[in-house]
Each structure stands twice: as structure tokens, then as C-alpha cells.
């Protein structure tokens, strides 16, 4: 076997997609032809889901019908709730719990074992159920582990507001609901990242949609992919607890050889466009609360890292302070990433099914050859 070895598959083209376009030099992200700044400002998460799954923005009538269908699928079967309670009692990590619960959801989906896993209409219905129920299982698990009861979904609320309602037991105000909806839009898709590629590899074997999403959640749980926003917030809290100037704290961390979370990206060579939008939201939340500490600390660190390391923040950097100011527990940040990205994972799986080919790369063998076998009693 010959050819250039591409570790990490960096820069390797393995598929064609109409879903998202990234210009790493210009700092641009596009979903199905629409710039992320426009979508974050004007579109709901439901509109973005429809766009990713159908390739076009919905009409008002289509959006109403689509949103109603999603809302109708939010409630959970008793068996799934029982699993969530058990995981909470065992103090399972949120990402492991979400992975297990999504897999458990398939046991209560009559179409989960539908013979033709590539049937688009069946998969679209399945996609609605998965996407509608993922926020519900996460909220249920989070409430169970703190000793609270399950809050049934409210079909009058949109996708974002309903999650916050099911998590906290009270309807969020307009600012929090709109901020969370925008965060879901920003995280909905991002090309062939590791978790998306994992979902595509799984679906390329003609495994089902639940298996693909479960694979993606497992991949996102790794520290090199998901989890950076939680690490950013833990860092900000450490800085706050130290009473040090943020730049001095970061300088000391760098001198110790530590990595500062939330900076740099495999694709962007400039500031992540999503970080720009979330930074503005973090600032607005701070102003509304009369407490600019977390935003100002983040800005100071961004400026220092930019000057000293030439690195720009990615989406995780400002999502940390945004979520924290919304009162979301830190260890739910990555599961929320999964709740949002499920729409993109599913969109890529639908594309994969439309023109499927088993994904089967090769490795360059570097081991021994022509060894003589020695029986076990002679070794």
C-alpha cells in the first residue's frame, strides 16, 4: 500500500455535502447557502432544522406544522424515564447518560427496526422523535439527579424554551429563551467534525438512525471534541477564585505548560464567527444582570491570548459565560451541544443514505512480518 499518510484525515475530502460551508480564512459559516449571522439573528432552531433536513427554509405554514409535530413528540415513555432515574441514582456522567438514554429511546420507537433503514420518509419521522426527545431526556436526568420530579413538556413553547422549562420547572423569560434558541442555531451543524463523521461511518454500514446518533454522542464526549466550553467555564471560575488579574493567571498557566481552553480551531484561522455572536450575547446578559465580570474576564483573556499566541477564540469560549449567566449547570454544556448538533448529525446521515458507500479507509501496516509461530509450551 502506497500513498501519503494523512493522520487525522486533515484536509482529506471524503464526501460531498450541501449542508454547511466553512471558510476558515474569512471566518464564515454557511448552512445550506445562508450565512450563520443571518440565521442566528432571524431564524429559530426549528427553521434551521427544517432547512438542514429539507434543503430550503419553510414557509409559515410548513414551519407551523413542523414545529407542532416536534412538540407532539417531546414526552417520554415510562421505560425511558425509569432508565433516567437509574442513571441519576448511579451518578452517571451527563454525556454517558444521554448516550444511554438515546439508545434506550429506540426500544420504544416502533420504526426503529424498520427493514429499509434508508427510507427517507421513515427517517424524517424518526428524526423528529429523536430531536424532540433528546432535550426531554437530558432535562429529566438533570432533575432526577438533584432529587426533583420530571416536568412534562409544554407544547405551547418552542424547542429552546421548552427545554429550559423542563430543566428548571418554570417558563424562561424572553431574553433567556431567545438566547438559548440562538445558541442551538449556532451549534446545529459544522461540516465533517469528528462526531458528524462518526455518525456517517455508522450509517454507511446501513445501521439505523438511533445507532448513528448514539455513535455521534459517544464521539462528542471525548475531551478533544466536546467539553471545551465546560473547561472554559471552570477556568473562568478558577481565575475568579484566585483573585488574580485574568491575564496574569493565564500567563502563569501558559508558563506551566497548560493549554487555555476555547482557543484555536482545526478549520478557522481567524475568529470563529459563532464566537463573535456569542460574545455579544454574553455581554448583553452581563449588562442585563448588572454583572459584567464573566464577560470582561473573557475579553481580557481573549486579548492576551491573541497578542501572545496569535490564537482566536472558538465557539466554546463565549458559550461558556453565556450558558453560565443563564444558570445552566457546567456539566450540561456538552450534552446541550449534542442536543443542538443532533439536527446536523441527522442531516448528514440523511445525505449519506441518499448516496451510500461503505466508509472503509485503510491503515499503513508497520508491524512485523514473516514471524515463525512458536507453540505455547515452547515460549
Swiss-Prot record:
Which InterPro entries does this chain map to? 2-MeCitrate/Citrate_synth_II, Cit_synth_Halo_CitZ, Citrate_synth-like_lrg_a-sub, Citrate_synth-like_sm_a-sub, Citrate_synthase, Citrate_synthase_bac-typ, Citrate_synthase_sf
Q: In which pathway does it act?
A: Carbohydrate metabolism; tricarboxylic acid cycle; isocitrate from oxaloacetate: step 1/2
According to its UniProt record, this protein's enzyme class is transferase
In alphabetical order, the GO MF annotations are: citrate (Si)-synthase activity
Residue positions of the active site:
225, 265, 316
Q: State the reactions this protein catalyses.
A: oxaloacetate + acetyl-CoA + H2O = citrate + CoA + H(+)
Keyword Acyltransferase attributed = yes
Q: Which UniProt keywords apply?
A: Acyltransferase, Allosteric enzyme, Transferase, Tricarboxylic acid cycle
Q: Does the record bear Mitochondrion in its keywords?
A: no
According to its UniProt entry, one GO biological process term is: carbohydrate metabolic process
- Give a GO cellular-component term: cytosol
EC? 2.3.3.16
The family database entries (PANTHER family) matched by this protein are listed as: CITRATE SYNTHASE (PTHR11739), CITRATE SYNTHASE, PEROXISOMAL (PTHR11739:SF4)
Whom does it interact with, and what assembly results?
A: Homodimer.
What other facts are recorded? When expressed in E.coli, CitZ is produced in a soluble but inactive form that can be reactivated by incubating with 2 M KCl. Citrate synthase is found in nearly all cells capable of oxidative metabolism.
- Family that this chain belongs to: Belongs to the citrate synthase family.
What function does this protein fulfil?
Might regulate the synthesis and function of enzymes involved in later enzymatic steps of Krebs cycle.
Provide the protein name: Citrate synthase
Amino acid at each position: 500500500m502506497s500513498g501519503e499518510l494523512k493522520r487525522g484525515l486533515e484536509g482529506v475530502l471524503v464526501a460531498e455535502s450541501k449542508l454547511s460551508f466553512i471558510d476558515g480564512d474569512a471566518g464564515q459559516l454557511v448552512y445550506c447557502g445562508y450565512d450563520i449571522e443571518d440565521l442566528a439573528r432571524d431564524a429559530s432552531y426549528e427553521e434551521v432544522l427544517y432547512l438542514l433536513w429539507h434543503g430550503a427554509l419553510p414557509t409559515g405554514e410548513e414551519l407551523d406544522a413542523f414545529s407542532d409535530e416536534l412538540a407532539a413528540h417531546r414526552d417520554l415513555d415510562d421505560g425511558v424515564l425509569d432508565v433516567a432515574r437509574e442513571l441519576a441514582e448511579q451518578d452517571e456522567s451527563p454525556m454517558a447518560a444521554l448516550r444511554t438514554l438515546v439508545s434506550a429511546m429506540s426500544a420504544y420507537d416502533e420504526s426503529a427496526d424498520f427493514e429499509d433503514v434508508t427510507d427517507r420518509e421513515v427517517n424524517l419521522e424518526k428524526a423528529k422523535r429523536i430531536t424532540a426527545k433528546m432535550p426531554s431526556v437530558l432535562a429529566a436526568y438533570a432533575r432526577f439527579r438533584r432529587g426533583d420530579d420530571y416536568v412534562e413538556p409544554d407544547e405551547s413553547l418552542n424547542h429552546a424554551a421548552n427545554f429550559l422549562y423542563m430543566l428548571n420547572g418554570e417558563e424562561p423569560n424572553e431574553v433567556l429563551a431567545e438566547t438559548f434558541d440562538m445558541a442551538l442555531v449556532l451549534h446545529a451543524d459544522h461540516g465533517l467534525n469528528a462526531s458528524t463523521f462518526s455518525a456517517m461511518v455508522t450509517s454507511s454500514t446501513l445501521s439505523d438512525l438511533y445507532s448513528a446518533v448514539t455513535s455521534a454522542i459517544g464521539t462528542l464526549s471525548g475531551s478533544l471534541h466536546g467539553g471545551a466550553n465546560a473547561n472554559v467555564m471552570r477556568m473562568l471560575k478558577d481565575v475568579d477564585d484566585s483573585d488574580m488579574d485574568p491575564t496574569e493567571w493565564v500567563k502563569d498557566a501558559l508558563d506551566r505548560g497548560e493549554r487555555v481552553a476555547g482557543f484555536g480551531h482545526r478549520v478557522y484561522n481567524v475568529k470563529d464567527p459563532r464566537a463573535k455572536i456569542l460574545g455579544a450575547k454574553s455581554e448583553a446578559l452581563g449588562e442585563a444582570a448588572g454583572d459584567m465580570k464573566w464577560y470582561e474576564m473573557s475579553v481580557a483573556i481573549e486579548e492576551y491570548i491573541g497578542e501572545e499566541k496569535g490564537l482566536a477564540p472558538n465557539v466554546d469560549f463565549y458559550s461558556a459565560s453565556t450558558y453560565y449567566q443563564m444558570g445552566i449547570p457546567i456539566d450540561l454544556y456538552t450534552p446541550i451541544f449534542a442536543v443542538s448538533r443532533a439536527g446536523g448529525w441527522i442531516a448528514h446521515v440523511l445525505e449519506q443514505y441518499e448516496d451510500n458507500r461503505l466508509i472503509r479507509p485503510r491503515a499503513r501496516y508497520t508491524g512485523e512480518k514473516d514471524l515463525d509461530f512458536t507453540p505455547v509450551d515452547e515460549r
